[in-house]
Amino acid sequence: MASGILVNVKEEVTCPICLELLTQPLSLDCGHSFCQACLTANHKTSMPDEGERSCPVCRISYQHKNIRPNRHVANIVEKLREVKLSPEEGQKVDHCARHGEKLLLFCREDRKVICWLCERSQEHRGHHTFLTEEVAQEYQMKLQAALQMLRQKQQEAEELEADIREEKASWKTQIQYDKTNILADFEQLRHILDWVESNELQNLEKEKKDVLKRLMKSEIEMVQQTQSVRELISDLEHRLQGSVMELLQGVDGIIKRMKNVTLKKPETFPKNKRRVFRAADLKVMLEVLRELRDVRRYWVDVTVAPNNISYAVISEDMRQVSSPEPQIICEAQGTISQTFVNFNYCTGILGSQSITSGKHYWEVDVSKKSAWILGVCAGLQPDAMYNIEQNENYQPKCGYWVIGLEERVKCNAFQDGSFHTPSAPFIVPLSVNICPDRVGVFLDYEACTVSFFNITDHGFLIYKFSRCSFSQPVFPYLNPRKCTVPMTLCSPSS
């Protein structure tokens, strides 16, 4: 019955907002009482300005000046906090669940409170046992030190949690700032830069989602980590405030839990290492895009012409060209001579379009290839055999106006050889900001020029051959070299 009365009293002095015993209780005109902190927080969220407010329970209006501290309720709460367990409940805690005897001893090896019968049992035989009063102070000091350590860890956990939230907010602000700048930069060139803007915004949005997702995960981990430490602290505080039995019962488990407490550092993302958008010179980009837009007006649908000389593998739609495996070449020749396998075989092939006048433009997809050569070739068919690695035939005087890639990163143009080495082409290393995955080729027959554009890098010019001598029809030229990944002629609609 006494327990029921205590429950009723506790309900009367419980805050309706936080559902805990009232702390610094304040009463309103309607008679309801709330914690001072809860009522203040409710004011800020419900009505931040001064004036009339309403009770969170009954909604009766009240004036802020009429709020008064309720010392009577505060005294009741204080008394309620001092109430101990009933004698019957205490007796249950003080007695061994197995033997019914009083728990007066503490086993050092098992870290358990035991009775005198437990001490004599096989389970505790030979163990060091002491009176509970003798070891209580020792464990009091241990748990007190552990509590201090956990409070420090709690502070560190809360600081880490605050840091990750601050970083999250900073990332959102920075991403929004970058997004605004991108939109402003491209506003002047909207009619020709829509595709560039879309690409940059997609990358930025992807970065935002990826980083914020990982930061959100870190934040959740930090919250869970902080909550775990709080719960352990609460358990320790309860033990330290309770009786000796409450302090020592299950102390082994609590100590193991404390030893397992480790704070995980959140994953962070230094802003100086992030991908930052760099707007190119808008005037230069405008000129580049205007030039690319102009030459794309002459886009022709190019396909390749099969022949019996080239060993290139051609797709059914006549758009993809790839290099076969060396073994296939040997089998085609009826021999598996190692000499022939090591010999560099011709995989160059012409486009089916014969060009004798006008302006012509096409694009070639070379993504994922480690080596390729492309451009234009004069004549009806490239030579069947030559040393590809030395590129002996790749010179304008031999009818080739081409550029190429080797070793995935080295981009070169091939000009006529010097006076001292006329048979070998002069290699012109090309500087490109981004290795091209897609190359545009523009041939102006009357102007005698062949230009190459890096479509991957907004269409910037890679190289231009001038004063070309077109004494006969010229054809688009592709050579996948030894890389078996195909190169693809793109359709005008792609």
Swiss-Prot record:
Reactions mediated catalytically: S-ubiquitinyl-[E2 ubiquitin-conjugating enzyme]-L-cysteine + [acceptor protein]-L-lysine = [E2 ubiquitin-conjugating enzyme]-L-cysteine + N(6)-ubiquitinyl-[acceptor protein]-L-lysine
Domain B30.2/SPRY: 282-494
GO cellular component, one term: P-body
Changes after translation: Degraded in a proteasome-independent fashion in the absence of viral infection but in a proteasome-dependent fashion following exposure to restriction sensitive virus. Autoubiquitinated in a RING finger- and UBE2D2-dependent manner. Monoubiquitinated by TRIM21. Deubiquitinated by Yersinia YopJ. Ubiquitination may not lead to proteasomal degradation.
CDD domains found in the cross-reference section: Bbox2_TRIM5-like, RING-HC_TRIM5-like_C-IV, SPRY_PRY_TRIM5
SMART domains, alphabetized: BBOX, RING, SPRY
Protein's job: Capsid-specific restriction factor that prevents infection from non-host-adapted retroviruses. Blocks viral replication early in the life cycle, after viral entry but before reverse transcription. In addition to acting as a capsid-specific restriction factor, also acts as a pattern recognition receptor that activates innate immune signaling in response to the retroviral capsid lattice.
Family matches, as PANTHER family: E3 UBIQUITIN-PROTEIN LIGASE TRIM (PTHR24103)
Domain notes: The B box-type zinc finger domain and the coiled-coil domain contribute to the higher and low order multimerization respectively which is essential for restriction activity. The coiled coil domain is important for higher order multimerization by promoting the initial dimerization.
Protein's UniProt name: Tripartite motif-containing protein 5
